[in-house]
Amino acid sequence: MDQGLSLNTLPLKELRNLIRNNQFTGSTTGCAAGYLQANLVILPAEWATDFLLFCQKNPVACPLIDVTQPGEKYLQSIGRDIDLSTDVPEYHVFYDGEFETAVSDLSTLWREDLVTFVLGCSFSFEEALIQSGLSIRNIDEGKNVSMYDTSIPCQSSGKFSGNYVVSMRPFTSIDAIRAIQITTRFPKAHGAPVHFGDPSLIGINDISTPNYGDAVEIKPNEVPVFWGCGVTPQNVIRQSRPPFCITHAPGKMLITDRLSSEFAVL
């Protein structure tokens, strides 16, 4: 399938089937407008309690939607027809904290001791921004969102520690204020930004070179606005070095059956 094709109007079931059958492996930004998108972190059960506490201590970076029992591939809370081992466009596999490979399904890697954490994603508030008349640059340019490692520390928990990863979207000052107001309503999608303006204040030395995703144009009259990001666990995994871990690939999310509006507040 043409990865550049807009999928906003494609019914969710059809999009999920494309992903499940490896016919769509691109970024899910702008896809399935209005539906909650989610990051995944899959760990051996012996590491799960520490990571659960890590999520609870860091709700902006890791807004927990739900967690499975060991070996469970399905979560009724997010959708009746979701298979956590097949329904993400691309998974990243880590051994001892080091990235090993990218795969399109987990059929040969699944184990009965694996616990899956489903974490909210900022893609979930994109539709609310668009409906309010705001333009999202990476969607307009047909790109993945820009994501950066930062110097912002997470609160440590057990084996897990590390720094935030953030996503960035540029806005004029007036639109940035509106974006802050809107995204504050979505705490399960990272909520309000963690920073805006000078990227060097959070350890980003070259905003034109994201650590993950794609670079986008930032116009002279715009400021970069930074949100917590579900790639944070991947940064933490590199430091904490669990023997085995699987995550989604940055920008390539699990799309749930739940509406983003169900998780809105205010």
From Swiss-Prot:
Single GO MF descriptor: lyase activity
Lineage: Bacteria, Pseudomonadati, Pseudomonadota, Gammaproteobacteria, Vibrionales
Membrane-traversing stretches: none
Family: Belongs to the D-glutamate cyclase family.
EC number(s) stated in the UniProt entry for this protein: 4.2.1.-
Protein's UniProt name: Putative hydro-lyase VF_1377
Keywords, alphabetical: Lyase
InterPro entries, alphabetized: D-Glu_cyclase (IPR009906), Putative_hydro-lyase (IPR038021), UPF0317 (IPR016938)
A Pfam family: D-Glu_cyclase
Enzyme class: lyase
